[in-house]
Amino acid sequence: VTHSHYDHVGGFDDLRPFCGNEDMPIYLRADVNADLHRRLDYCFREHPYPGVPTFKMNIIDNNPFYINGLKIVPVEVMHGKLPIYGYRIGKFAYITDASHISEEEKEKLENLDVLIINSLRDKPHFAHFSFDQAMDMIRDLSPKRAYLTHLCHEAGCHTELESRVPAGVSPAYDGQIVLSTR
Protein backbone atom coordinates (compact mmCIF):
# COMPACT_ATOMS: atom_id res chain seq x y z
CA VAL A 1 0.00 0.00 0.00
CA THR A 2 1.42 3.42 -0.91
CA HIS A 3 -0.52 5.47 1.66
CA SER A 4 -3.90 5.66 3.38
CA HIS A 5 -5.73 8.30 1.36
CA TYR A 6 -9.17 7.01 0.45
CA ASP A 7 -8.56 6.95 -3.31
CA HIS A 8 -5.86 4.35 -2.61
CA VAL A 9 -7.52 2.21 0.07
CA GLY A 10 -11.25 2.76 -0.44
CA GLY A 11 -11.58 -0.56 -2.24
CA PHE A 12 -10.33 -2.68 0.67
CA ASP A 13 -13.86 -3.73 1.59
CA ASP A 14 -14.35 -4.93 -2.00
CA LEU A 15 -11.58 -7.50 -1.51
CA ARG A 16 -14.10 -9.79 0.25
CA PRO A 17 -14.36 -12.34 -2.58
CA PHE A 18 -10.58 -12.61 -2.83
CA CYS A 19 -9.93 -13.32 0.86
CA GLY A 20 -11.80 -16.61 1.13
CA ASN A 21 -10.90 -18.31 4.38
CA GLU A 22 -7.41 -16.83 4.57
CA ASP A 23 -6.08 -13.44 5.56
CA MET A 24 -4.88 -11.46 2.54
CA PRO A 25 -1.28 -10.28 3.03
CA ILE A 26 -0.88 -6.49 2.93
CA TYR A 27 2.48 -4.67 3.07
CA LEU A 28 2.43 -1.14 4.46
CA ARG A 29 3.99 1.48 6.70
CA ALA A 30 3.12 1.50 10.41
CA ASP A 31 1.23 4.81 10.12
CA VAL A 32 -0.88 3.46 7.25
CA ASN A 33 -1.60 0.31 9.27
CA ALA A 34 -2.85 2.43 12.19
CA ASP A 35 -5.09 4.45 9.86
CA LEU A 36 -6.60 1.32 8.31
CA HIS A 37 -7.24 -0.22 11.72
CA ARG A 38 -9.22 2.90 12.65
CA ARG A 39 -11.17 3.10 9.38
CA LEU A 40 -11.79 -0.61 8.87
CA ASP A 41 -11.92 -1.74 12.48
CA TYR A 42 -14.50 -4.41 11.61
CA CYS A 43 -11.85 -6.22 9.54
CA PHE A 44 -9.48 -6.59 12.49
CA ARG A 45 -11.76 -7.80 15.28
CA GLU A 46 -10.96 -11.02 17.10
CA HIS A 47 -14.16 -12.58 15.74
CA PRO A 48 -15.00 -10.71 12.51
CA TYR A 49 -18.45 -10.92 11.01
CA PRO A 50 -18.68 -13.72 8.39
CA GLY A 51 -17.71 -12.53 4.93
CA VAL A 52 -15.75 -9.50 6.12
CA PRO A 53 -12.37 -9.26 4.38
CA THR A 54 -9.51 -10.12 6.69
CA PHE A 55 -5.89 -9.15 6.27
CA LYS A 56 -2.44 -10.05 7.52
CA MET A 57 -0.72 -6.71 7.94
CA ASN A 58 3.03 -6.77 7.28
CA ILE A 59 4.70 -3.61 8.55
CA ILE A 60 7.54 -2.41 6.32
CA ASP A 61 10.05 0.41 6.47
CA ASN A 62 12.17 2.00 3.79
CA ASN A 63 14.25 -1.15 3.27
CA PRO A 64 13.88 -3.90 0.67
CA PHE A 65 11.69 -6.89 1.55
CA TYR A 66 10.75 -10.09 -0.24
CA ILE A 67 7.46 -11.67 -1.22
CA ASN A 68 7.86 -15.27 -2.40
CA GLY A 69 11.48 -14.55 -3.31
CA LEU A 70 10.64 -11.37 -5.25
CA LYS A 71 12.56 -8.32 -4.03
CA ILE A 72 10.41 -5.24 -3.40
CA VAL A 73 12.20 -1.92 -2.86
CA PRO A 74 10.19 0.85 -1.17
CA VAL A 75 10.88 4.31 -2.57
CA GLU A 76 9.98 7.09 -0.17
CA VAL A 77 8.47 10.09 -1.95
CA MET A 78 6.72 13.17 -0.66
CA HIS A 79 3.01 13.66 -1.26
CA GLY A 80 2.90 17.31 -0.24
CA LYS A 81 4.11 17.10 3.37
CA LEU A 82 3.21 13.41 3.72
CA PRO A 83 5.93 10.78 3.23
CA ILE A 84 4.53 7.82 1.27
CA TYR A 85 5.97 4.84 -0.59
CA GLY A 86 6.29 4.01 -4.22
CA TYR A 87 7.76 0.62 -5.10
CA ARG A 88 10.41 -0.84 -7.35
CA ILE A 89 10.16 -4.49 -8.39
CA GLY A 90 13.01 -5.57 -10.62
CA LYS A 91 13.19 -3.10 -13.51
CA PHE A 92 9.65 -1.80 -12.87
CA ALA A 93 8.68 1.10 -10.57
CA TYR A 94 5.31 2.50 -9.50
CA ILE A 95 5.26 6.04 -8.08
CA THR A 96 1.92 7.69 -7.40
CA ASP A 97 0.86 10.84 -5.57
CA ALA A 98 4.42 12.18 -5.54
CA SER A 99 5.31 15.86 -5.45
CA HIS A 100 9.02 15.37 -4.68
CA ILE A 101 11.59 12.58 -4.81
CA SER A 102 14.90 13.14 -3.02
CA GLU A 103 18.19 12.51 -4.81
CA GLU A 104 18.86 9.56 -2.48
CA GLU A 105 15.55 7.92 -3.35
CA LYS A 106 16.03 8.64 -7.08
CA GLU A 107 19.08 6.36 -6.94
CA LYS A 108 16.65 3.49 -6.32
CA LEU A 109 15.00 4.34 -9.64
CA GLU A 110 18.04 4.02 -11.90
CA ASN A 111 18.10 1.62 -14.87
CA LEU A 112 14.34 1.07 -15.12
CA ASP A 113 12.60 -0.61 -18.01
CA VAL A 114 9.20 0.71 -16.89
CA LEU A 115 8.25 3.69 -14.74
CA ILE A 116 4.65 4.45 -13.83
CA ILE A 117 4.46 7.96 -12.38
CA ASN A 118 1.71 10.38 -11.41
CA SER A 119 0.93 13.42 -13.56
CA LEU A 120 -2.16 15.08 -12.14
CA ARG A 121 -2.66 17.97 -14.58
CA ASP A 122 -0.84 20.88 -16.25
CA LYS A 123 -1.37 23.34 -13.40
CA PRO A 124 1.04 22.86 -10.45
CA HIS A 125 -0.35 21.17 -7.34
CA PHE A 126 1.21 21.08 -3.88
CA ALA A 127 0.90 17.30 -3.47
CA HIS A 128 1.17 15.85 -6.99
CA PHE A 129 3.53 16.16 -9.93
CA SER A 130 2.17 18.33 -12.70
CA PHE A 131 2.54 17.19 -16.31
CA ASP A 132 5.80 19.17 -16.71
CA GLN A 133 7.21 17.92 -13.40
CA ALA A 134 6.42 14.31 -14.33
CA MET A 135 8.05 14.78 -17.73
CA ASP A 136 11.14 16.29 -16.05
CA MET A 137 11.32 13.29 -13.70
CA ILE A 138 11.00 10.89 -16.64
CA ARG A 139 13.83 12.69 -18.47
CA ASP A 140 15.94 12.64 -15.29
CA LEU A 141 15.40 8.92 -14.61
CA SER A 142 15.48 7.81 -18.28
CA PRO A 143 13.36 4.64 -18.11
CA LYS A 144 12.91 2.68 -21.33
CA ARG A 145 9.10 3.21 -21.05
CA ALA A 146 7.03 5.50 -18.85
CA TYR A 147 3.32 5.69 -18.17
CA LEU A 148 1.51 8.69 -16.70
CA THR A 149 -1.08 7.80 -14.07
CA HIS A 150 -3.30 9.49 -11.48
CA LEU A 151 -4.53 11.88 -14.16
CA CYS A 152 -7.41 14.13 -13.11
CA HIS A 153 -10.24 15.46 -15.25
CA GLU A 154 -8.18 18.60 -15.90
CA ALA A 155 -5.42 16.59 -17.63
CA GLY A 156 -7.30 16.43 -20.92
CA CYS A 157 -8.52 13.47 -22.93
CA HIS A 158 -6.34 10.46 -23.65
CA THR A 159 -5.74 11.22 -27.33
CA GLU A 160 -4.73 14.80 -26.50
CA LEU A 161 -2.21 13.56 -23.93
CA GLU A 162 -0.83 11.00 -26.39
CA SER A 163 -0.05 13.82 -28.82
CA ARG A 164 1.90 15.73 -26.14
CA VAL A 165 4.27 13.03 -24.93
CA PRO A 166 7.51 11.87 -26.56
CA ALA A 167 8.15 8.35 -27.82
CA GLY A 168 8.41 5.91 -24.94
CA VAL A 169 5.88 7.78 -22.77
CA SER A 170 2.14 7.06 -22.71
CA PRO A 171 -0.82 8.12 -20.61
CA ALA A 172 -2.01 5.05 -18.72
CA TYR A 173 -5.64 3.94 -18.68
CA ASP A 174 -7.87 1.96 -16.35
CA GLY A 175 -7.40 -1.78 -16.72
CA GLN A 176 -4.12 -1.44 -18.59
CA ILE A 177 -1.66 -4.32 -18.22
CA VAL A 178 2.03 -3.36 -18.25
CA LEU A 179 4.65 -6.08 -18.58
CA SER A 180 8.22 -5.88 -17.34
CA THR A 181 11.10 -8.27 -16.80
CA ARG A 182 12.72 -8.91 -13.46
Language-model features: where?
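Binuclear metal-ion centers of metallo-dependent hydrolases, dominated by the metallo-beta-lactamase
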Residues: 102-114, 121-182
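A broad detector of the eukaryotic-type serine/threonine protein kinase catalytic domain
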Residues: 17, 120-121
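Binuclear metal-dependent hydrolase catalytic cores
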Residues: 1-95, 161-182
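Structured catalytic/translocation cores of nucleotide/phosphate-coupled proteins
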Residues: 3, 10-16, 115, 134-135, ...
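Short, acidic Gly/Pro/Ser/Thr-rich loop/turn segments
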Residues: 34, 81-82, 101, 122-124
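Active-site-proximal loop/helix segments of hydrolase catalytic cores
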Residues: 78-81, 90-118
